[in-house]
Every structure is written in C-alpha cells, then in structure tokens.
Amino acid sequence: MKTNDIRELTTAEIETKVKALKEELFNLRFQLATGQLENPTRIREVRKAIARMKTVVREREIGINR
C-alpha cells in the first residue's frame, strides 16, 4: 500500500490494518522458523508497510501535513 493511499484512511482504519499486519508478520516469522516460508521477501514488505502506517499516524499526532 502506497503512502498516499494510507494518508486517505482514517487513523482507526490504519490502526486496524497495523494490527492485521502484525499478526501476519508473526505468522510469517513462525513459518520462517519452521522452514515452511515460501516467500521470505514478504517479511520485509510487511515490516515496511507497518512502518509507513505508523509514520502517517505519527505525522498526524505532531501536525505535519503532507
């Protein structure tokens, strides 16, 4: 999800998506540990998506408009 798309969401929607992505990341790490992970780059993608969403939320908290 692109940053501009994230900025169009409400803060509550972003928090919901972050929670879902954290669950997915947990499952991906579990698969990695058990040797069942087919796409290891997905871990990186999910981590970066979480970071983007948290950045947008933080921008809103401190009043940065982009």
Curated annotation (Swiss-Prot):
One of its GO terms (cellular component) is cytosolic large ribosomal subunit. CDD domains: Ribosomal_L29_HIP. Keywords: Ribonucleoprotein, Ribosomal protein. GO terms for molecular function: structural constituent of ribosome. Pfam families: Ribosomal_L29 (PF00831). InterPro entries: Ribosomal_protein_uL29 (IPR050063), Ribosomal_uL29 (IPR001854), Ribosomal_uL29_CS (IPR018254), Ribosomal_uL29_sf (IPR036049). Gene3D superfamilies: 1.10.287.310. One of its GO terms (biological process) is translation. PANTHER family: 60S RIBOSOMAL PROTEIN L35/50S RIBOSOMAL PROTEIN L29, LARGE RIBOSOMAL SUBUNIT PROTEIN UL29C. Belongs to the universal ribosomal protein uL29 family. This is Large ribosomal subunit protein uL29. It comes from Bacillus anthracis.
